[in-house]
């Protein structure tokens, strides 16, 4: 596929203009601009479960990529004005002004270092000390399409570790949305084609539907057991169970796993 054809498919000119405009804005201004431009059709359930103040972690599944962050921002700003995101460090490398809303994380193992990890934890500690709302997509990667269904990737245990260390309540959030067929076609071909479509996948979602379901809050005291086991249970609860049974608590869900085991 030639570059001109690819650029035409991906609306490169429009994407470039938007990216250049965002370079002049702070993170919060950028999120507001994108939320206004995209005007998602949001189907929100359980927003009253989100505390209006105090430190907390919103732990969400990751179906589409950048659009997930904008959709969550659009929902949370109805209740909170202090939201920050754990997000790929590339966002801050592209625009250093995003530090007002992004705690940079190196999700890829080959990009990590002890110094970068310490800096991420330092910034997270500051956010919790300021009693902020911290959003984490613990997979760090988009869900995969398998046999026509989206499968959430494995979660990093950071979300559980932070909740315990910072004594932060977790608000589970199930998101339901899809990318375009073009994205999934490219994703099957190779990772490079998949990755260059991500900004296009954000901008092509104008007036698209997002379902956002908040589950009952999870206390750090509910996160008993090994970090690996708790993280896996939390992933399955948020990505799958919560979308089907929005009123089930995490503790009740874990009890069913014990009974089945």
What are the functions of these language-model segments?
Residues 1-59, 69-71, 78-80, 252-261:
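Membrane-anchoring hydrophobic helices of lipid-metabolizing enzymes
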Residues 9-13, 57-113:
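Catalytic core of membrane glycerolipid acyltransferases/transacylases, capturing the structured
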Residues 41-47, 88-91, 120-127:
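Short, charged beta->alpha transition segments
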Residues 52-53, 94, 145, 181:
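Short secondary-structure boundary/hinge segments and terminal tails
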Residues 117-261:
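Non-catalytic C-terminal accessory region of glycerolipid acyltransferases
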């Amino acid at each position: 596929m030639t570059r001109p054809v690819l650029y035409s498919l991906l609306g490169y000119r429009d994407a470039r203009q938007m990216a250049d405009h965002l370079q002049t804005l702070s993170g919060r201004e950028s999120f507001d601009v994108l939320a206004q431009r995209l005007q998602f059709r949001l189907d929100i359930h359980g927003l009253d479960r989100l505390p209006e103040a105090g430190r907390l972690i919103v732990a969400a599944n990751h179906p589409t990529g950048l659009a997930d962050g904008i959709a969550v921002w659009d929902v949370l700003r109805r209740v909170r004005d202090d939201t920050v995101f754990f997000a790929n460090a590339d966002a801050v490398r592209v625009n250093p002004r995003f530090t007002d809303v992004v705690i940079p994380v190196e999700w890829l193992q080959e990009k990590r270092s002890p110094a970068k990890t310490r800096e991420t934890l330092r910034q997270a500690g500051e956010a919790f000390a300021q009693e902020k709302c911290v959003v984490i997509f613990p997979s760090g990667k988009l869900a995969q399409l398998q046999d026509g269904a989206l499968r959430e990737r494995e979660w990093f245990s950071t979300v559980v570790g932070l909740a315990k260390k910072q004594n932060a309540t977790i608000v589970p959030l199930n998101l339901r949305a899809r990318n375009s067929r073009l994205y999934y076609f490219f994703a099957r071909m190779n990772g490079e084609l998949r990755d260059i479509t991500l900004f296009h996948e954000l901008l092509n979602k104008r007036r698209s539907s997002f379902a956002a379901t908040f589950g009952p809050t999870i206390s750090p005291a509910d996160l008993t057991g090994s970090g690996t086991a708790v993280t896996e249970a939390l992933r399955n609860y948020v990505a799958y169970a919560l979308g089907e049974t929005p009123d089930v608590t995490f503790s009740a869900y874990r009890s069913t796993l014990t009974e089945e085991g």
